[in-house]
From Swiss-Prot:
Cofactor: Ni(2+)
Protein name: Putative nickel-responsive regulator
Lineage of producing organism: Bacteria, Pseudomonadati, Thermodesulfobacteriota, Desulfovibrionia, Desulfovibrionales
GO molecular function, one term: DNA-binding transcription factor activity
InterPro entries in alphabetical order: Acetolactate_synth/TF_NikR_C, ACT-like_dom_sf, Arc_rbn_hlx_hlx, CopG, CopG/NikR_regulator, Ni_resp_reg_NikR, Ribbon_hlx_hlx, TF_NikR_Ni-bd_C
Annotated source species: Solidesulfovibrio magneticus (strain ATCC 700980 / DSM 13731 / RS-1) (Desulfovibrio magneticus)
GO annotation terms (biological process): response to nickel cation
Amino acid sequence: MGQTIRFGVSLNSELLEKFDALCDEKSYQTRSEAIRDLIRGVLVQKEWEQSDKEVAGVLTLVYDHHTSDLAQRLIETQHEQHDVILSSMHVHLDHHNCLEALVLKGPGEAVQRLSQKLISTRGVKYGKLTLATTGQEIV
């Protein structure tokens, strides 16, 4: 990590009040910490927009495992793309519903393609890809 450099930011008073309220709500000790997180968030988003960059993310799926062949179809799709899946966790939410969390890593395009294929599988009740970073491009 390089040296820390101070710089100024000019905001109108209403925006600053909202930002300070957000900092309090999120328990940031200083505005600088919040601004650093905002910048990192934009940089992670930029990584994801470059489809050849290696990215990481977590895909969350909720589905009824009693739905005909659904669990088998999801497993088959996961096996087809095993090189993108680092880890998976399967949780029984109740008698019918399961939550599956997949940790993904690979080229952005491959991660997004696999996520969309799993989310759009007939019978999946909920699916969301949470963007993350490998940390290699973030300081």
